[in-house]
């Protein structure tokens, strides 16, 4: 074979799309599609048609550029098998490692609190509206559900992980199926409410504020940051030695782009289908009731008068069940990350990093009591879920997903080539706007 043929063959091999790339594309996509998606239509549809159209324009750039920035940070370490904690320690020392451990824990733990509130409200709504049973004590329901999940986690962790992986695709398929099945129920209410002569850009209910708050729920819903570090390590081990760091970065960006497109297509279609079936006022009611959109859809179809279609009857019961399964799936997935993070913090600060001073069983018990106890307190208090996402969950995710990579690009020599780019400004702006929601909620 000539030198030219070898070069052509090498280039063809480099440009090929492998089965592992498809697996990771679907893995990133599946990680992001969870219970958080069930609240996106409520916030997106709350302000009517124009804000959700603006969110549609922003959705892909937010998903792609923010996750690409985090992936570039993970790629910047000298060790191809090093995770994000090792990479941050390499750039910023041990203090940086402690900071990233705290960020990871506090980025995931509030999500468990959110899911604790959500699963309690969803179950109680299903119990009272679909099953027509008398109301139960909120504290008892929250405690029962959390103890049930704790039992499953304690005695069947391996089974739980396997079941979670099987639930991802049926949940995504059910979202797409529901979105398509809602089309016959679409109406023009959301379009009729558009009054171009009376549009307010500013103010509490203005378009800009609605989109600003919508950015937070997009950061929350379009989030697969927990798996980015593992994804980058896998791709570096697969590609870097043979093709180099630059090619690996392009391959990671390509996979993140395709995963983001899939994610945005499914979530935005679901959001639009819900909005055209319901109305902005219905979305406001769902927010006030503190329930996910599927539970509200179930109640909506239950209240229809006259003869119901088969779909309406199935959705009346099926929507809440799908929501419960989605929340269970998301809770289990985030619990594992929270447990790992809290174990690390307890070990580091309680036992000075000495693993011989405490058994793993005792460590897991201490962490589980704190996690489940704090989740029960929040679930019983029943704060508004969207407010909790916007004021707590999304800002912490944004600090990890957006601001940490941008700070690293400014400071780390290995990331210097990415400085001065327009997409850095965009990612920084998204991170700051999301964090500033905390200030907005206070005032």
Swiss-Prot record:
Catalytic reaction(s) noted: L-threonine(in) + H(+)(in) = L-threonine(out) + H(+)(out); L-serine(in) + H(+)(in) = L-serine(out) + H(+)(out)
Ordered alphabetically, the record's keywords are: Amino-acid transport, Cell inner membrane, Cell membrane, Membrane, Symport, Transmembrane, Transmembrane helix, Transport
The question of whether Cell inner membrane is a record keyword is answered with yes
Family matches, as Pfam families: Trp_Tyr_perm (PF03222)
Topologically, how does it sit relative to the membrane?
Answer: Multi-pass membrane protein
Biological processes, Gene Ontology terms: amino acid transport
Q: What is its main location?
A: membrane
- Write out the annotated subcellular location: Cell inner membrane
Enumerate the InterPro entries for this protein. Answer: Amino_acid_transport_2, Hydroxy_aa_transpt, Thr/Ser_transpt_TdcC
Q: Which GO terms describe its molecular function?
A: L-serine transmembrane transporter activity; symporter activity; threonine efflux transmembrane transporter activity; transmembrane transporter activity
List the transmembrane segments. 22-42, 44-64, 97-117, 140-160, 163-183, 207-227, 259-279, 319-339, 366-386, 389-409, 423-443
Q: Name one GO cellular component term.
A: plasma membrane
Write out the function statement from the record: Involved in the import of threonine and serine into the cell, with the concomitant import of a proton (symport system).
Give the UniProt family note: Belongs to the amino acid/polyamine transporter 2 family. SdaC/TdcC subfamily.
Annotated protein name in UniProt: Threonine/serine transporter TdcC
């Amino acid at each position: 074979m000539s030198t030219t043929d070898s070069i052509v063959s090498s280039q063809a091999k480099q440009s090929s799309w492998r089965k592992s790339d498809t697996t990771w594309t679907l893995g990133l996509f599946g990680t992001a599609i969870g219970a958080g998606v069930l609240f996106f239509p409520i916030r997106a549809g709350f302000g009517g048609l124009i804000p959700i159209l603006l969110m549609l324009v922003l959705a892909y750039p937010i998903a792609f550029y923010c996750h690409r920035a985090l992936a570039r940070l993970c790629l910047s370490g000298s060790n191809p098998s090093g995770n994000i904690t090792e990479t941050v320690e390499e750039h910023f020392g041990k203090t940086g490692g402690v900071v990233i451990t705290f960020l990871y824990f506090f980025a995931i733990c509030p999500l468990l609190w959110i899911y604790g509130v959500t699963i309690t409200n969803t179950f109680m709504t299903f119990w009272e509206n679909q099953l027509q049973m008398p109301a139960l004590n909120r504290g008892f329901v929250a405690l029962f559900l959390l103890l049930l999940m704790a039992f499953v986690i304690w005695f069947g962790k391996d089974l739980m992980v396997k079941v979670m992986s099987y639930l991802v695709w049926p949940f995504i398929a059910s979202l797409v199926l529901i979105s398509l099945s809602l089309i016959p129920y679409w109406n023009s209410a959301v379009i009729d409410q558009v009054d171009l002569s009376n549009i307010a850009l500013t103010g509490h209910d203005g378009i800009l504020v609605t989109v600003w708050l919508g950015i937070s729920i997009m950061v929350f819903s379009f989030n697969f940051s927990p798996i980015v570090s593992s994804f980058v390590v896998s791709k570096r081990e697969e590609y870097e030695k043979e093709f180099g760091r630059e090619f690996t970065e392009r391959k990671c960006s390509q996979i993140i782009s395709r995963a983001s497109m899939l994610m945005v297509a499914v979530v935005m279609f679901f959001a639009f289908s819900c909005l055209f079936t319901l109305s902005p006022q219905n979305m406001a009611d769902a927010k006030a009731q503190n329930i996910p959109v599927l539970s509200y859809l179930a109640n909506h179809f239950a209240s229809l008068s006259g003869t119901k279609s088969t779909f309406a009857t199935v959705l009346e019961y099926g929507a809440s069940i799908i929501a419960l399964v989605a929340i269970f799936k998301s809770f289990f997935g985030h619990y594992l990350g929270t447990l790992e993070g809290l174990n690390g913090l307890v070990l580091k600060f309680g036992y000075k990093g000495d693993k011989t001073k405490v058994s793993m069983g005792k460590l897991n018990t201490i962490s589980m009591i704190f996690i489940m106890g704090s989740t029960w307190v929040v679930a019983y208090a029943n704060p508004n879920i969207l407010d909790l996402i916007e004021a707590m969950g999304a800002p912490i995710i944004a600090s990890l997903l957006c601001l940490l990579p941008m700070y690293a690009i400014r400071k780390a020599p290995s990331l210097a080539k990415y400085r001065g780019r327009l997409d850095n400004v965009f990612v920084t702006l998204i991170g700051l706007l999301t964090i500033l929601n905390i200030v907005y909620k206070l005032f």
